[in-house]
Amino acid sequence: MRNLAVRYLLLISLLGQSLAAAAGAPAKTLCQAPCTSEGGWELSVGLGLGMSTNPLKGGSDIPLLVRPRLSYYGERVFLDNYEAGVMLWENSSQQINLLVLPSLEQLYFRRWQYASGGFSLDPDFIKGEGAAESTGDKPPHLHHRHTSALGGFEYNASLGGFFDGLEFNWQFLEELSGYHAGREMRLAISRDFLTYWRASLGANFQSRDYINYYFGVSASEASPLFSRYTPNSGGWSKLVRVEYLKPLSPHLAIKGGAALKIFSSAVADSPLLEESSVYSLFLGGVYYF
């Protein structure tokens, strides 16, 4: 109960500070360009061709055709799509933030249906329509994987000296919504190069409880298709990302990117998965309103 109370106090503190918008230095000043000017809202929409693979058994690739982005950076408060926070402290090269954001793992499980070829993501889910009728046997019961609210601290630093040009990001997050008692720690380094390019390397640690909630198989869920599975421990997943952004005018830019995530063995060993990694690709244009 004490840990749950601390988590909700953290969330309440963040929301309270967001509403108060206390005066101070600009929030999230170390964000990647193009950054929203202090006190301003920015809305952009990316249109193009892209996809993200689904690691679940029989999971269909997820199309990435429209990529909206809404951001706001105030004096201490910031909102960047699904991420909201309050800047607690900063100097010329470092920053500490209080952060709230949703989990993403549940997206793999949206509108699953069991067809003759196995499980697949219902393509109508991507288009925002109703669920298609299943064409095979009734799927084994899997509990609903909820979207979890994650909250915690973030540290950003622009490095100098031998590492000049590198940006470092660290996040420590706890589950706030009470679905599981998981924790996640994220590490990443990024660098701009060749004017329009940006490369990032990272690693995410997810605790045993976190992995078990999304990728474990409980006794009530076990079936001939999916044996019971509980991870023995947490694990580190590795990530690499390359992005391209070339402005053509104040309102238009070309954007592309590719990303690869290699799951930890604790995730990859789940009987729900048939792939131990996921990758995504996107190429298109972005319009800034």
Q: Which residues are covered by each model-predicted region?
A:
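A conserved mid-domain beta-alpha-beta active-site/ligand-binding segment of alpha/beta enzyme cores
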Residues: 227-239, 245
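Outer-envelope beta-barrel architecture signal
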Residues: 37-45, 64-66, 75-77, 92-98, ...
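Outer-membrane pore/translocation modules
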Residues: 31, 82-190, 195-205, 212-232
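Cleavable N-terminal export/targeting peptides
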Residues: 1-39
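Surface-exposed strand-loop-strand hairpins of Gram-negative outer-membrane beta-barrel proteins
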Residues: 52-66, 115-117, 140-143, 266-269
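Predominantly the C-terminal beta-signal and adjacent terminal strand-loop region
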Residues: 244-289
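Residues on the lipid-exposed face of transmembrane beta-strands in outer-membrane beta-barrel proteins
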Residues: 47-49, 68-74, 85-88, 153-163, ...
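Short glycine/proline- and aromatic-enriched beta-strand/turn motifs that initiate or cap beta-hairpins
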Residues: 23-78
